UniProtKB/Swiss-Prot annotation:
This is Protein TsetseEP. Expressed in the gut, but not salivary glands, of female and male flies (at protein level). Present in vesicles in midgut cells and in the lumen of the gut. GO terms for cellular component: extracellular region. It comes from the Eukaryota. Residues 1-19 form the signal peptide. It is found in: Secreted. Residues 192-320 are annotated as: Disordered. Keywords: Repeat, Secreted, Signal. Pfam families: DUF725. Residues 194-311 are annotated as: 59 X 2 AA tandem repeats of P-E. The keyword Membrane does not apply.
């Protein structure tokens, strides 16, 4: 029974590996899985294992097949990337190829015209005329082709190296994963399946806090009514300009007072007896000057009245 189960396991693994591509990964994975499978079947420890081998195969065979499928997928991806890179480089060279085809066609056309000449002289004359042009065009075609060949060789070689490195990485990852799974399978066949660890009870999710009720939005305050625009005050009427006051008429100048006429001297009378000399009359006080009025001319001062001459004394009694 154990042998039958082991043989079925080997067939399943080999059938999975046989479908891998590209060829390098397929052959390398196939060789690796065969060696590990036969080594597992020849192990004495596995032959003395208990009755729980079916459970071990049920657990690890799908995992080994999955590892092989992942290696196949990775190798296919590497090969596809390499193919895409080669096609891209080929498309780049197509433009140069078309330009070279034009030059080659011109050479063929010229030489073909010479071949069609029946006359020998015309034939060689045509070859002579087209030889220089053909050599120049052929030289350009040869130089360009040499550069393209050298560049493509380098690019394609690099693409191939990258593809090989990618496939090697895919194989190594699949090999490492398969190696780990084979080791776990061997331990399972010898020691049995480990008891499953109790799954930790999921922590109760904290009850969501009640969302606070949204505060009511404050009612918008009513917009204040626009105040009525104040009526424009009437413009004050312009005050009438005051009439100019009439200029005061100039007061008439006072007429000058007439000067008093001098009194006539009295005729000498016969000298009487000498009488006592009369006392001289006091001189009349000068009249006060009137106060000057505004802007009138000053009045002339009155001349003082002449004083009466004293009566002369008679020199003698007989003065006629």
């Amino acid at each position: 029974m154990k042998f039958f189960i082991s043989f079925a396991f080997l067939c399943l693994v080999l059938s999975c590996v046989a479908a891998l591509s590209p060829d390098q990964v397929e052959s390398r994975l196939k060789s690796y899985v065969e060696n590990r499978s036969f080594a597992l079947l020849r192990s004495g420890r596995v032959a003395r294992a208990g009755t729980n081998t079916v459970q071990c195969y049920d657990k690890y065979v799908p995992l080994i097949r999955q590892a092989a499928a992942e290696g196949k997928f990775a190798s296919d991806k590497c090969a596809q990337e390499g193919q895409n890179a080669r096609e891209e480089e080929t498309k780049k060279s197509e433009v140069i190829r078309e330009s070279l085809n034009v030059k080659v066609a011109s050479i063929e056309k010229g030489l073909g015209a010479c071949v069609a000449k029946y006359d020998v002289l015309e034939y060689f004359t045509c070859l002579r005329d087209h030889a220089s042009e053909s050599q120049t065009a052929a030289g350009e075609v040869g130089k360009t082709s040499a550069v393209i060949v050298e560049g493509l060789n380098i690019v394609l070689t690099n693409i191939e190296l990258r593809e090989k490195y990618c496939i090697d990485q895919a194989f190594e990852q699949a090999q490492e994963k398969s190696d780990i799974l084979f080791t776990e399978l061997e331990n399972c066949l010898i020691e049995g399946l480990p008891e499953p660890e109790p799954e930790p009870e999921p922590e109760p999710e904290p009850e969501p806090e009640p969302e606070p009720e949204p505060e009511p939005e404050p009612e918008p305050e009513p917009e204040p009514e626009p105040e009525p625009e104040p009526e424009p005050e009437p413009e004050p009427e312009p005050e009438p300009e005051p009439e100019p006051e009439p200029e005061p008429e100039p007061e008439p100048e006072p007429e000058p007072e007439p000067e008093p006429e001098p009194e006539p001297e009295p005729e000498p009378e016969p000298e009487p007896e000498p009488e006592p000399e009369p006392e001289p009359e006091p001189e009349p006080e000068p009249e006060p000057e009137p106060e000057p009025e505004p802007e009138p001319e000053p009045e002339p001062e009155p001349e003082p009245e002449p004083q009466p001459e004293p009566e002369s004394k008679p020199n003698s009694l007989f003065n006629f």
